[in-house]
Amino acid sequence: MKKLLSILAMSLLFFSNVNAEERESELNNLFKQLKNSEATKAIEIENKIWKIWSIHPSNDRRGYRLTELLVQGSFLMAEKELNGAYEIFSQIILVDPNWSEAWNKRATVLYLLGRYQQSQKDIDEVLKIEKRHFGALSGQGLVQTELKNYEKAINSYKEVQKIYPSMQAPKVMIPRLKELIKDQSI
């Protein structure tokens, strides 16, 4: 398994040898495209953004190792080994608290564990670092829905729509949340 994870991390890194300025420029360009793309093209752009986010921004040994750890944690999360994934993402955050994707992954694990308040705190950290993180904003919508803060959830999804207009989650969730609010007032 460790060898497979190393291969995955190295394949991500093979195409990622860009400096921070180039990375930010690439993200800015992709976000402009995302805002104006139809659904099919937007999914391709979304995948490119996720790829950039999933690679640590520093092109040194430490950055490669942190990327490798993120891949390991993601694998554990996919295998439903949530406590192990939580530990790995926490290690990454200790080493580099400025990498938004480590916070985002840990927020996801916390959500899956039903620890919604803690998940929201991690989402707040993601959004301090990367305010355009549509994954974190969409996750915030889910967290706020679980906490029965339906207006906050709607606002999160509206923020997603500003960044990623063709994303399906807001189109599905906003009407559902409006129904929940309506049902509460009866």
Predicted regions and their residues:
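Sec-dependent signal peptide recognition
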Residues: 2-8
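TPR-adjacent "capping" and linker segments in tetratricopeptide-repeat scaffold/adaptor proteins
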Residues: 21-22, 52-68
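Terminal, low-structured helical/coil segments at or just beyond the last alpha-helical repeat
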Residues: 36, 55, 59, 155, ...
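Alpha-helical adaptor scaffolds
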Residues: 63-130, 135
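Register position in tetratricopeptide repeats
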Residues: 78, 112-113, 146-147, 176-183
